[in-house]
Amino acid sequence: MKNFFSMHAILLACSAGAGLAAITQGISEGTYSRIVEMATISQAAYANLCNIPPAITSAGKIYNAETDINGWVLRDDSRQEIITVFRGTGSDTNLQLDTNYTQAPFDTLPQCSGCAVHGGYYVGWVSVKDQVEGLIHQQASQYPDYSLVVTGHSLGASMAAITAAQLSATYNNITVYTFGEPRTGNQAYASYVDETFQATNPDATKFYRVTHTNDGIPNLPPTSQGYVHHGTEYWSVEPHGPQNMYLCLGDEVQCCEAQGGQGVNDAHVTYFGMASGACTW
């Protein structure tokens, strides 16, 4: 299969807006493998963690019946990591959260001055906040040398982003991997994430916002409603591999977002050849 776009076409596509986004082609094998591993866990969350790596065990379930937010706190003793993963949209209740674009003040994180986040996802976060913080505190107390990882796809990606921002007030060893993440907050929130996780510095970042070809969900909610993406975008094109990952840094309209995808499409439900909940990998 040919590459999804030539580099020339990518640069043209990314030149919309005030200026040209900075594009870097290729990432290391190690970073790519790590991203794919987190994508596996995020996609498996749609089917009760089917086919996750055998070294990873569940330390507790996250669930709220009113919002239908689902997730797990996991532990990988081989890597000394405590992993929190959120499932993406899996019900009409979740869809109601998805479409609540009214921004909500990020009141649970007063350190984030002026920050507002997606109203539906904030409702989701508040509904499970105590569970998440309790489970992570339990694991972090028992395994104080372990680092924290937060991940998720789609709705789960925004939940992961909000969770990581919240946890940053307590922990300083957090790495985040999101897949098909919608825009999650306003400029103040995006700036907070960028600063906290060094998200605009590919050499030091602790936040990997991964997109895929023309996935339509990263185009939502629209910027006209005050939403802004945070950090460097890690754009995956096909055929999948470390050399077909592009780091897109700069303008809001960049790589995936510039391809015209709208809403849930094939590129959204499949990342690195793994369909959400299909468990065929």
UniProtKB/Swiss-Prot annotation:
Glycans are attached at residues 100, 173. Gene3D superfamilies: alpha/beta hydrolase. InterPro entries: AB_hydrolase_fold, AB_hydrolase_lip/est, Fungal_lipase-type. It catalyses: feruloyl-polysaccharide + H2O = ferulate + polysaccharide. Substrate binds at residues 98, 101, 268. The active site is at residues 154, 215, 268. The keyword Disulfide bond applies. Keywords: Carbohydrate metabolism, Disulfide bond, Glycoprotein, Hydrolase, Polysaccharide degradation, Secreted, Serine esterase, Signal, Xylan degradation. GO terms for cellular component: extracellular region. It is found in: Secreted. Residues 1-21 form the signal peptide. Its EC number is 3.1.1.73. Pfam families: Lipase_3 (PF01764). CDD domains: Lipase_3 (cd00519). GO terms for molecular function: feruloyl esterase activity. Belongs to the AB hydrolase superfamily. FaeA family. Involved in degradation of plant cell walls. Hydrolyzes the feruloyl-arabinose ester bond in arabinoxylans, and the feruloyl-galactose ester bond in pectin. This is Probable feruloyl esterase A. It comes from Aspergillus oryzae (strain ATCC 42149 / RIB 40) (Yellow koji mold). The gene is faeA.
